[in-house]
Curated annotation (Swiss-Prot):
Official protein name in the record: Probable copper-transporting ATPase PacS
Species of origin: Synechococcus elongatus (strain ATCC 33912 / PCC 7942 / FACHB-805) (Anacystis nidulans R2)
Subcellular location: Cell membrane
Gene3D superfamilies according to UniProt: 3.30.70.100, Calcium-transporting ATPase, cytoplasmic domain N, Calcium-transporting ATPase, cytoplasmic transduction domain A, HAD superfamily/HAD-like
Residues bound to a metal cation: 14, 17
Length: 747
């Protein structure tokens, strides 16, 4: 038995921290899998409860200097309020540190200008540059940035290094040298070392890093806006009918089987079934479907949707954490906390990044000191290398884009189950569309019935056929039963019923052995169908599904069944083709019927006469040719194919089994969601590549420049203050670029 637990993490300063936590959790006995997401500040852990417990995992994380606790319930208003208060307090405290350090740093820079420029500046007294005064002003700045040093010490005790290590070593080295100059200036001069102090550089660096961290925290908070928006859709109260009275109750007190009244203009508070009234309901906020949906007695309604025109009384069927909206929130949370395969590259880099930077800084100091013997130059370049390096940008490049992308998908009624699914969707080459319920409405109806014999015999045959099909759950069977009932027939008892998947059904009705199924299957049973062959072919050529009715081994009638195409089917097929994708239709219908329907929607490749148990094999066959395949379906018999496909896309109007087997779910059932999901995946992955490019180029270019590579050519060195500014804003730029995805709109 394996349990899964999502933990919220606090205290991570960069991606190296996330990698460190992931490694220590993986090393615990009983932990089978662990994924730490720096952007989401969460860890997903799969563990064997017989070998370890959540408390032990938390203790290990706490021992490493971080904080961990189980993911809080987002539906708990009190917990949510506490989290908002905590985040607001944290941002307020960080802002105060930014202001304090910024003001003092400005004063230190102003006081240092005459010394740096070598001239007297009116209005700036020279005593402002006194080392003792600057030391006193720098100490509050170090206190404001104490988290860098505390986290660096924690990392050192664990024999590891993080971004905080780079900051602490860089500013710490500059501070200790400046302190030595302040306390022992003459001794340093006798040693041939310049009596220069770097207090203003230290203060500016810490102020800029704190500013960058403040902006980063604010931006990261915006990436989870989709979750907060979804939760905000839920009604706060409900009008519940109990003992003949209408009571206005908090939504948390509504129970299953309660009768709930919803007036025009009010939100539907819970999932339920209409038991009285008629109305139109706007479901766009949950499903993405723009047109209001008619609702009447017997129809299902979704909590958080908006009742438009009439008054409804509904029977609550799902409340609290079981509602459709709650399940959406849970899926989006899981997707945002998951890790995309492309993240592995950044994880591999951040694993050795900090030690490599420290080594480069030491080498830089040694080379410059040995080359020109100038300790000031050597110190400036070494500190610059330590300060400019930024593993945070690498760590944020992928998770922030994933969080925004999955949240944006939810806005369009597209549930993406994991970051891997979102990444895979942009590589799709072939899209297989199941015909029934995907390209078509999924509500087939009998259009023609032709029987051998007089009217009485026709009615008898229709009654037998409807009776036999009444034992089947196939959509075509339901169509035949509905047609029979509309003709006024009475259903009979059936014995020895048997369903042959992909072929038909058989059984005894009133002592007659009856078979209803495809022409191929009837032929395999030795039943001659030539008497009605011409009509059979004509109906199939018109795109209709035709089944034969045989009694005691002889064909007696045929029925044609049609399922209307969805209004969006033709446009969606064209859109997929414009995206450069190969579109394939899969159906159990015979070749003539399948070709007629495919031609109507513009599909040229058809997989016809495919039994339900063969669908997964058809997907595998396309994959064996090197194709990245997406399967779109809605029924139970589509589940194996959805699981086999590289990306399984379930129509939300279908079965729970199909949805569970899929990677992406289209809540509204609108096929346009397929196009939107692929476009969103491509936009997200483009955004991630941009982020990774910026992060890599920034470090690849920034570190050599800070090390002084341009000095021999241009005589210019990068100031540690500029290095600090560049490092601070590199992470902010990555998060800001990820937030651009919030402007995504399908084309």
């Amino acid at each position: 038995m394996v349990n899964q637990q999502t933990l919220t993490l606090r205290g991570m300063g960069c991606a190296a921290c996330a990698g460190r936590i992931e490694a220590l959790i993986q090393a615990l006995p009983g932990v089978q899998e662990c994924s730490v997401n720096f952007g989401a500040e969460q860890a997903q852990v799969c563990y064997d409860p017989a070998l370890t417990q959540v408390a032990a995992i938390q203790a290990a994380i706490e021992a490493a200097g971080y904080h961990a606790f189980p993911l809080q319930d987002p539906w708990d208003n009190e917990v949510e309020a506490q989290e908002r208060h905590r985040r607001a307090r944290s941002q307020r405290q960080l802002a105060q540190r930014v202001w304090v350090s910024g003001l003092i740093a400005s004063l230190l820079v102003i006081g240092s200008l005459p010394m740096m420029l070598g001239i007297s500046i009116p209005g700036i007294p020279m005593w402002l540059h006194h080392p003792g005064l600057q030391l006193g002003l720098t100490l509050p700045v170090l206190w404001a940035g104490r988290s860098f040093f505390i986290n660096a010490w924690k990392a050192f005790r664990q024999n590891t290094a993080t971004m905080d290590t780079l900051v602490a070593v860089g500013t710490g080295a500059a501070f200790l040298y400046s302190l030595a100059v302040t306390l022992f200036p003459q001794w340093l001069t006798r040693q041939g070392l310049p009596p220069d102090v770097y207090y203003e550089a230290i203060a500016v660096i810490i102020a800029l890093l704190l500013l960058g961290r403040s902006l980063e925290e604010r931006a990261k908070g915006q990436t989870s806006a989709a979750i907060r928006q979804l939760i905000g859709l839920q009604a706060k109260t409900a009008r519940v009918l109990r003992q003949g009275q209408e009571l206005t109750l908090p939504i948390t007190e509504v129970q299953v089987e309660d009768w709930v009244r919803v007036r025009p203009g009010e939100k539907v508070p819970v999932d339920g079934e209409v038991i009285d009234g008629r109305s139109t309901v706007d479901e766009s906020m949950v499903t993405g479907e723009s047109l209001p949906v008619q609702k009447q007695v017997g129809d299902e309604v979704i909590g958080a949707t908006l009742n438009k025109t009439g008054s409804l009384t509904i029977r609550a069927t799902r409340v609290g954490r079981e509602t459709f909206l709650a399940q959406i929130v849970q899926l989006v949370q899981q997707a945002q906390a998951s890790k995309a395969p492309i993240q592995r590259l950044a994880d591999q880099v951040t694993g050795w990044f900090v030690p490599a930077v420290i080594a480069i800084a030491i080498l830089t100091f040694v080379l410059w000191f040995n080359w020109i013997g100038n300790v000031t130059l050597a110190l400036i370049t070494a500190v610059g290398v330590l300060i400019i390096a930024c593993p945070c940008a690498l760590g944020l490049a992928t998770p922030t884009s994933i969080m925004v992308g999955t949240g944006k998908g939810a806005e369009y009624g597209i549930l993406i189950k994991s970051a891997e699914s979102l990444e895979l969707a942009q590589t799709i080459q072939t899209v297989i569309l199941d015909k029934t319920g995907t390209l078509t409405q999924g509500q087939p109806s009998v259009t023609d019935f032709l029987a051998i014999g007089d009217r009485d015999q026709q009615q008898t045959l229709l009654g037998w056929a409807a009776s036999l099909e009444n034992y089947s759950e196939h959509p075509l069977a339901e169509a035949i039963v509905r047609y029979g009932e509309a003709q006024g027939i009475t259903l009979s008892t059936v014995t020895d019923f048997e369903a042959i998947p992909g072929s038909g059904v058989q059984g005894q009705v009133e002592g007659i052995w009856l078979q209803i199924g495809t022409q191929r299957w009837l032929g395999e049973l030795g039943i001659e169908t030539s008497a009605l062959q011409n009509q059979w072919e004509d109906w199939e050529a018109a795109g209709k599904t035709v089944v034969g009715v045989a009694a005691d081994g002889h064909l007696q009638a045929i029925l044609s069944i049609a399922d209307q195409l969805k209004p969006s089917s033709v446009a969606v097929v064209r859109s997929l083709q414009r995206l450069g994708l190969q579109v394939v239709m899969l159906t159990g219908d015979n070749r003539r019927t399948a070709d007629a329907i495919a031609q109507a929607v513009g599909i040229t490749q058809v997989l016809a006469e495919v039994r339900p148990d063969q669908k997964a094999a058809q997907v595998a066959q396309l994959q064996s040719r090197g194709q990245v395949v997406a399967m779109v379906g809605d029924g139970i018999n589509d589940a194996p194919a959805l699981a086999q496909a590289d990306v399984g896309i379930a129509i939300g109007t279908g079965t729970d089994v199909a949805i569970a087997a899929s990677d992406i779910t289209l809540i509204s059932g609108d096929l346009q969601g397929i196009v939107t999901a692929i476009q969103l995946s491509r936009a997200t992955m483009t955004n991630i590549r941009q982020n990774l490019f910026f992060a890599f180029i920034y470090n690849v270019a920034g570190i050599p420049i800070a090390a002084g590579i341009l000095y021999p050519l241009l005589g210019w060195l990068l100031s540690p203050m500029l290095a600090g500014a560049a490092m601070a804003f590199s992470s902010v730029s990555v998060v800001t670029n990820a937030l651009r995805l919030r402007q995504f709109q399908p084309r």
